[in-house]
Structure formats: structure tokens, C-alpha cells
Amino acid sequence: MRPPAGLPSLSRRSRILLVVAVVVAALLLVGPRLIGMYTDWLWFGEVGYRGVFTKVLLTRFVLFLVVGIVVGAIVWLAMLLAYRARPVFVPVSGPNDPIARYRTTVMSRLRLFGVIIPVAIGILSGLIAQANWVTIQLFLNGQPFGITDPQFNLDVGFYTFDLPFYRFVLNWLFVSILLAFVANLVTHYVFGGIKLAGRAGTFTTAARVQLAVIAGTFVLLKAVAYWFDRYSLMSSSRKEPTFTGPGFTDINAVLPAKLILLSIAVICALAFFASIFTRDLRIPAMAVALLVLSSVLVGAVYPMIVEQFSVKPNAAQKESTYIERNIEATRQAYGITEENVDYVDYPGVGTKQPQDVPADRTTIANTRLLDPTILSPTFTAQRQLKNFYGFPQTLNVDRYEQDGQLRDFVVAARELSPNNLSGNQTDWINKHTVYTHGNGFVAAQANEVTAVQGDSQNNTGGYPIYSVSDLTTTPENENLKVDNPRSYYGEVISQSDADYSIVGSVDGEGPREYDTDTSKYTYTGSGGVSIGNWFNRLAFAAKYTERNILFSSAIGSNSKIIFKRDPKERVEEVAPWLTTDGAAYPAVVDGKMQWIIDGYTTAQDYPYAQRSSLDGLVEDSIDQTTGRLIPRQEFSYIRNSVKATVDAYDGTVTLYQVDEQDPVLKAWMGVFPNTVKPKSEISDDLQAHFRYPEDMFKVQREMLAKYHVDDPSEFFTNNAFWSVPSDPTIDTSANQPPYYVLVGDKDTAKADFRLTSPMVGFSRELLSAYISVANDKENYGKFTVLQLPTDTQTQGPQQAQSAMTSDSRVASEVSLLKQSNKIQYGNLLTLPIAEGGILYVEPLYSQRNSQNAFPQLARVLVSFSDTNGIRIGYAPTVSEAISQIWPGAGSAATVTQPAPDPDTGAQPETPTTPTAPAPPASSDDVTKALAEVNSAMAALKSAQQSGDFTSYGAALDRLQKAVDAYQALPR
């Protein structure tokens, strides 16, 4: 009989070509990764965090080796045992027996198959497992929380640090045993240990014993998994969205079921081991059937019966204890316990005149007019200087001392904007060696603008009043002065595709970088990676696929390449364990321009705490407008434990510990020692610019919307819940963002910088609460929640917006403005005022319908409701608008300053108070003038439709006269 043929062998030439192809493919696959690792290694050395890079790399590598070796070794051992126990003689069933052919092939390349398969499986397993380096390091460096869960009385640290590691180990043991079972089974089959004949198969003793041991081990691991499943119940999602954590069914049905299934799994494993001696596989088969049946009946059907027939008919009573646990745990996990939150009953109706309340006078004086989400085009038009400079799409709000008083400012760094380069500016030399940095820090006091004219169509006022610190300008306010205003790192700079610049002196050549029209500059900072040697130049040329880096004469022995210029990216690289806030903002700290970034530590599986996701909680109208990408990161514990700074000139990254109690941060400080500086090293000037982060606040306000409720029954019905109001200034239903405001402290009347948000009733529009959090050093992170009565009739943001825009004065003038302008409603601020009342303030911006136009403040709208109804103020200034509600109260507001020269945009050196306005026109005069405007517009439309040019011209003249008459009325 002719023996089965093996696989055909390759010729020598074919083998050489195959080897070359494999090497080339490996280089293409691995080469860019190696280059990236090398340039990253250089970068981490530049910023002083190379220990982070090596620690992460080493942890990944060790994890890759350990898991790869363990999984590969178990598979190899299973194959080896099966091969060594093969029958001595294996009869061939016929000339076409396929197994015989495979057996011959394997025997001819025994070492190849015996090594390649386990090695390949091990490598693949290691590559997958190394991504879990965080789990390993947190297990090795975990810290106690000092809080225990209410069910097992275990420290929360067990659930956040230990349990994920045990699950990780258990999962890979499952994978290893399952792969070993398959490998052992296939090997026995190929070498005759298992024969399939007719409807039944036969096993050799060795095959039966080995497979029974492996299967028994697998079931034994399942028993261990059932034990750990009990702890995983502490983050059960069965009762979501009502609450997170185990409810009545989980505790009284699922938890006992896990112990029952554990016992059955142990019995099943023993049955497999017993089959080694009984030589009867029917017993373990019956045990497996029992385990499967029990999993269905005990693990699923019984809990379902309890849930449907015992819990649901009495849910409020049955779940009461577990809702209490959820409330307490969620408050702890999100930092909204009674230690941090002060609840204050607030009537919602004013009881005094604002001018009689010192704190209200401070609030009115600091009412913010400038909206940082609208004014970027205005900053660009008036303070850009050069086409290659730019400002971010959304500006920032911060506070500084001005004339001894705390004031809030809209601030921005004037950054390099590589995407704005045009013409020859985009040449590689110019783009990467000439236009390398931004110039200046620009601030505008948020409660001041140049004088707005009574004529809303006039475009000479309503602009920010700037304080600029750059290479040619020094601000009067020393707190805004930057010693070195050049910025090599920033949000705008990093938005270009290849965000790198090459700096440093070249022997024999003068400065190359653009500084001003009359001077050039050579970078002298510590930032940047040296590319003075050819090896580094080659690495970066390959990284950016740019040959000019190799051959350009603009690069010398002292040259450095600056890359990774986004402040947030730099922080995320040196602290990969942090989740960063969406807003990085510039601040002048000790004479330097610093980017400040908030960092969050998070954890999953906090027992009974509500599970959340950033993308589900923090997105608001601003995020929708800017298209910001929010990470889909789930967590049930969060702390703002780290404040990071990035120097705008040299890129130095510094991490500061601001929460000394956070066990997650302590764990990471154990993983990466000496990377986070203690709180004591934060300077007073830096502390003065710390803001409570917006993303953290948005997460906490969502939690407070539910978890301010103490009573489980009330919690279950949702009756007392709040909601984040939708932003009334846009057309979508996106959440209203929180706003930074300066308000008067109720005790001292001093200006207090706070982050605020109104809250409306659940599925209602009336105001239910007002949440604010302090930003000053003494009270940082302390919440104040003003709770309105449940029967309140205080208008919410949507209602206030509707009331203001439907006012006859507002509606008529806005309709007129829209004829030739784009109208934008600015941030609708909610301000507690008048000892119990709520004042809404909203700037109205206009922008002409022309290519180079930009927004300017046109009007200010205010709204206040009390027992006498809703009162609306509408005027060019805050002072006038508030005085329309409370005569004389607006005198506390900051007066506007004269408009700048329209040609230069420069502000006057000495602010002056505008002359007193003429007495306002009577309402009858205004009504008549508006009626004439409307009538003239109707006549114009009729003449246009008729096609009569004579009538059209007359109607146009009539409309112009009507508009002039309306605008001439004193306001």
C-alpha cells in the first residue's frame, strides 16, 4: 500500500524569497513602532519623566513574558503529554484516510509544529495581556480607602485594586486550560489516541485521563469564579437606571445561588477526577449536565421569579435598604457628602432691594458681559497682529487682582497658528524654523466693554477692553505681565498635522525665528529634543517622513526639535493614569505663562456607587458646537486629585497633588514615585488661579440631581429629582454649561469666584435649585446648593429666555437687527440676588453680515420674577437694564468706557465715565416709532412684489426715515 504523501517542500530559491518577504513585512510592521518608541524615549528624557516611560514599558514587557510563557507552556505541555502517550501502532483505515496524511505531515516536521503552535499562542496571548498593565500596577501598589462595603465588610480598596487582578488571573487561566484542552484533544486525535468509529468513539486510557484532568481543572476554576462573582455583585447593574449595586434579588437570590453553583462545580470537578479511576465518563457527563441545569434554574430562573413575583409588586419597600446603600456610596464616590455640600433653603422670591444688600452690589458690579464662547473672532480681529497668530475657538475665564479688587477676565494666549500660514509662509523652512512660536497674553476684563451706543446698529462700541502683555506691550496691571511672552506650546499650535518646530542656533548664522517685524530670535529654553547628531535626525526624518530634516542646512549641532506641543497631550503622556479635563487654560503665574490642566483619578467597581461615563455626563452645548471628543470612560469613583502645569515657553510639565486623601492617587504615586509634587509646593500665585474644573462639576451636578434626596421612597419615585436645564441660547436640547461668575460673598460682600449651574425640576422648566462651588484657597471644592420650595414658581433658564425674547422692546429691535446682522445670545447667567430672588443676565451680540465682521455687545437683557410678576430689563448697559427693574440698583454696575478709535481698535489710556444719557423716550413714542417701522417694511415688501420701481424707491425711503426716527429716540 502506498504511504500517504506529505506536503510538498519548497525550493531553495522559494525559501530565500519567503524569508526576504517575511523580513520586509516585519520591518514595515515593527519599524515605525521602534522609531516611535525611540523618539518617545528621547521626549520623556527631555521632560524629565523617563522613569514613567521605562516603568510602563517594563511592566508591559514583563506581563507579555509571564502570560505568554504561562499560556504557551500549558499548551505545549498538553500537546507533549498527548504525543508521548500516543499508541505505538495506529492502523490506517484506508488509502484515503485524511488523518494519516496529517499525521505524516506532523511527524515530518514534529519540532516545528510542537514549538511554533505554543509559541504563536503564547505571543498572541502576551500581546493581548500586556495592555492590562494598569491592573497589575494598581494591585501591587493599592491603598486602603478606609471605607468598607455594607455587605461583606471589605475595604473598598479590595474592589478597586485587588478584585480586578484576581479576575485578570482567573480569565487567563480559563483561556490557558481551554486552549490546553483543545490542543490535547487534537493531538490525541491526530496520533490515534481518540478514534471516531460509527456513532461512538474510543479513547485510550491516556487520552481519557488527560482530558478528564484538564476538564476537571476547568470546572474547578469555574468554582473559584463563582466565589469571586459574589464580590462582583457589589457593582450589579440589575437595578439600573434606578440605582447601581445589588438589590433585594441579588442579595437574597443571586448571592445564595452563587454558593450553590460553587458547590455543584466542586462536585463536578471531583467527578472528572474520579473518572480517572472509575474509567467511566458517564459520571462527569452527568455532573456537567447538572451544573448546566443548575446554572439555568438556580442562577437565572429562581432570581427571575423572586424579582417578578416578590420584588416588583413591593419594589419601594423591598429595595429601600439597598437604595440607602446606593445613596451613601455614590455620595462618597463622587465627593458630594455632607462634608462637601451645604444645602440651604432658598425662597426663590426676593425680599430686599439689591442696593440694600452689600453682597448684591458686588454681584452687580461684577456681572460678566463677555462670553468666552463667542468672542474668539473679536479677539482675532482686534488683537491677532499677524495672520499666523490665532486664538482658540473657545476662550477662558480666570480672575486677577485689578486695582486691589478681584476681577474676572476673559483670557487667551496669542498662539502660533500653523494652519493660518499661507503662500511662501508654508515653505518647510518657514513653517518649521521661522514661524515657531506665539507672542503674548491677552486679557479683557469680563464686566467691561467700550461704550455701547443707544443706536443698536452703531458699530463703534461694545468691544472688549484689552490688557496685552507681549514683546512690544506691557500692561498696566502687573498681575497680567509676562516676563517672556513667547509661547512654544499651546492648544492652537498643536492643531496642525505635523506640529513640530526646529529651534536653536546654527554655527555661522544669526537668529532665524520670527519675533517682531524688526527682530528675530533664537530659542534658549530647555524644551525640545536634540537633533544635533545624525542618528536622531534620521529617526525624526523617518517619524515625520520628511527628508528636509536630514538635508537642511538650517539644522546644526545645537538644533532641537519641539514636538508634542498640546499641553493636555503632554500631561497625558507623563501621567497616563490621569483623565484630563476638557479645558486647558493659560494663566500668568509668577511672571510666567503657564497652562493649567486638571487631572482626574478614576476607578471602577466602587461598591454600590452609581456607574457613570464621561461622554454621557459632561457633554453640553459648548461641546456640541466645538465638536470636542469626550472619552467614553466608565467609572464609579472620581476625584480631581492633580493639577498640572505646562510652561508655555519651555514645555516643562509639573504635576501637583491637590487631594491628599485620594487612595487612587496614592497608589499611582507608589507606581511612579517622585512624579507628583506634594501640595505644599504649590505657590500662592499658582493657587490663586486654580479653578474648579468644569467636567468634574458637570459630573457632580448630575449626581446631585438625584443624590441630594435622602429618603429611599422619594428616591424611588423620582419626584424630588432635578435636571440640568437645556441651553436656551441654542436650537438644540443640549445641556446648559456651567459658568464661572464673580458674586458677592453673603458674609463679607467681597467678590467670590464660583462655578455655577441652575437646576430645574425633573421633566419641568421651573427652577428647583442653584448649585455653586467655591474656587478660593480656603473653601476650594465646597458646594453650596440653594434649594427652592417644591411649589416654587421661580422661572428657569428656558422660561427666562422666553420671557426676555418675547418682550415687545426686545422682539422688535432684534427683528430689526436681523435685517443686516447676525444675532447671538451670550451666556445666560443665573445670579442669586435680593435676599431670596434669582436674576438672569444675558448679553446680546450682533455681527454684521459681512466677511470681516466680528461680534460686538449690542444690548444686555435681564429678567427677574417675584410676586408682582416677571420684570424685564433691556438696555445698552447692565446698569441701565438693572435700573429698569430696580431704579437705582444699576448704579453698582461697572460703567462702560468710551469706544476706541475704529481705525486702530486701541483703547483710551485713561478710562472716562460717559456722559449721562438723555431721558428715555416714553413707551408711547417707542410704540409709535416701531409701528411706523413695521408699516414701512410691509410697504417695501408689497412694492417689491409688484415690480413697480417707483413705488419700491418710495417705500425704501419711507423705511429709512422710520428707522432713523426710531434710532433717534433717547434711551
Curated annotation (Swiss-Prot):
Its main location: membrane. Keywords: Cell membrane, Membrane, Transmembrane, Transmembrane helix. The keyword Transmembrane applies. It is found in: Cell membrane. Coiled coil: none annotated. Residues 890-927 are annotated as: Disordered. The chain crosses the membrane at residues 16-36, 61-81, 112-132, 172-192, 209-229, 257-277, 286-306. Pfam families: UPF0182. It is a multi-pass membrane protein. GO terms for cellular component: extracellular region; plasma membrane. InterPro entries: UPF0182 (IPR005372). Belongs to the UPF0182 family. HAMAP family: UPF0182. This is UPF0182 protein RER_22310. It comes from Rhodococcus erythropolis (strain PR4 / NBRC 100887).
